[in-house]
UniProtKB/Swiss-Prot annotation:
Required cofactor names: Zn(2+)
SIS domain location: 37-194
Annotated organism of origin: Actinobacillus pleuropneumoniae serotype 5b (strain L20)
MF terms in GO: carbohydrate derivative binding; D-sedoheptulose 7-phosphate isomerase activity; zinc ion binding
Keyword set, alphabetical order: Carbohydrate metabolism, Cytoplasm, Isomerase, Metal-binding, Zinc
Name under which the protein is recorded: Phosphoheptose isomerase
Pathway in which this enzyme or protein is active: Carbohydrate biosynthesis; D-glycero-D-manno-heptose 7-phosphate biosynthesis; D-glycero-alpha-D-manno-heptose 7-phosphate and D-glycero-beta-D-manno-heptose 7-phosphate from sedoheptulose 7-phosphate: step 1/1
Enzyme class: isomerase
Assembly behavior: Homotetramer.
The reaction(s) this protein catalyses: 2 D-sedoheptulose 7-phosphate = D-glycero-alpha-D-manno-heptose 7-phosphate + D-glycero-beta-D-manno-heptose 7-phosphate
Source lineage: Bacteria, Pseudomonadati, Pseudomonadota, Gammaproteobacteria, Pasteurellales
Length: 194
């Protein structure tokens, strides 16, 4: 009944991944992002992650695998997903949703920390505001975007962009793959110092 559609969906997902992988720059950027985060941890820094909708879930997933574990039993790494419901509702009510992430960074972000911001469009106002505050505080910024990078293009120290223009879900599929690779590389890199 739906076999052709299922195969078409899987094929499109594979095609987007193949296109992403065929650009060597993307492979280098993933390594750069992993080293940036690992170096922050080695210097006593932390990573703060944020995004909206599915990207918010990916930001939480990234943080929990840093504080918990990915594949290896090892010490937890300092990571916070900006996802506290009381904070989000307070700032949304008192200042506006576009400030939910930047306000948190104003409170806890420090020089040497890393902001890991996700936006499939690259145009999420609250992530853009977080990038601005992170830069003002001397933090490093990793952006995971899609399409043409949107307004986030060129703002991050490392931008990993999935140049897919049809649907956000294809971009998110690559984002979660990249997150898992980052976890693997961070565990490799941090094990060197253990």
């Amino acid at each position: 009944m739906y076999l052709a559609q299922i195969k078409a969906e899987l094929q499109e997902a594979a095609d987007v991944l193949d296109k992403f992988m065929s650009d060597e720059k993307n492979i280098q950027l993933i390594q750069d992002a992993a080293l940036l985060i690992s170096n922050s941890f080695k210097q006593g820094g932390k990573v703060l992650s944020c995004g909206n909708g599915g990207s918010h879930c990916d930001a939480m997933h990234f943080a929990e695998e840093l504080t918990g574990r990915y594949r290896e039993n090892r010490p937890g790494y300092p990571a916070i997903a900006i996802s506290d419901v009381s904070h989000l509702s307070c700032v949304s009510n008192d200042f506006g949703y576009e400030y939910v992430f930047s306000r948190y960074l104003e409170a806890v972000g420090q020089k040497g920390d890393v902001l890991f911001g996700l936006s499939t469009s690259g145009n999420s106002k609250n992530v853009l505001n977080a990038i601005k505050v992170a830069k003002e505080k001397g933090m490093k910024v990793i952006a995971m975007t899609g399409k043409d990078g949107g307004q986030m293009a060129g703002l991050a120290d490392v931008e990993i962009r999935v140049p897919h223009f049809r649907y956000a879900d294809r971009t998110q599929e690559i984002h979660i793959k990249v997150i898992h690779i980052l976890m693997m590389l961070i565990e490799f890199e941090m094990a060197k110092q253990a």
